[in-house]
């Protein structure tokens, strides 16, 4: 998710893949970046940040998408939080998937019926957050979006982007 957004932004970065099985995320060097021992995390100069949603919003504010109004900022934050707190668990927690998915994807399908991206005609960090979870659902749990054609088209549209192919599509 974060790597995809960095590619979309064209921001130079160093990607470090931790060997989770070997416990690299629990070593003091990484714990100094993220004391929760989770990925992703970034280091930008002396600034360290963890949690994908926080990182996405930080990158948007720093490199591209700082909206003019509080309302626009809040709408972006709404979608990033929805992706991490609601959509992700609804798609990936098996005990919730069957019950939650229709309640999540039906309105999302309606929203995407009339526009190519969540906030209109241009890809935004909101699409990176939501689109990542949708793409991973297709890749990791073989989720079929056939009942949600606008969502299926959205996932296809995102997956055709070069930055997506370079990152999520390459896994």
What are these language model-derived features?
Residues 1-103, 109, 114-116:
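GST-like domain detector, emphasizing the conserved glutathione-binding G-site
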Residues 19, 125, 171:
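Short, solvent-exposed turn/loop segments enriched in Gly/Ser/Thr/Pro and often Arg
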Residues 71, 79-162, 167:
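GST-like fold's C-terminal all-alpha helical module
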């Amino acid at each position: 998710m974060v790597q995809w957004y960095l590619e979309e932004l064209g921001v130079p970065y160093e990607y470090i893949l931790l060997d989770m099985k070997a416990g690299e995320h629990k070593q003091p060097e990484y714990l100094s970046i993220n004391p929760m021992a989770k990925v992703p995390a970034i280091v930008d100069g002396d600034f360290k940040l963890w949690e994908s949603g926080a990182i996405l919003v930080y990158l948007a504010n720093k490199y591209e998408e700082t909206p003019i109004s509080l309302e626009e900022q809040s709408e972006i934050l709404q979608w990033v939080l929805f992706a991490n707190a609601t959509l992700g668990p609804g798609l990936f927690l098996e005990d919730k998937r069957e019950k939650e998915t229709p309640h999540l994807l039906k309105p999302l399908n309606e929203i995407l019926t009339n526009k190519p991206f969540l906030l209109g005609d241009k890809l935004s960090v909101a699409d990176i957050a939501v689109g990542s979870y949708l793409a991973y659902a297709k890749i990791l749990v073989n989720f079929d979006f056939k009942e949600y054609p606008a969502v299926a088209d959205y996932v296809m549209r995102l997956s055709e982007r070069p930055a997506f192919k370079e990152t999520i599509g390459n896994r």
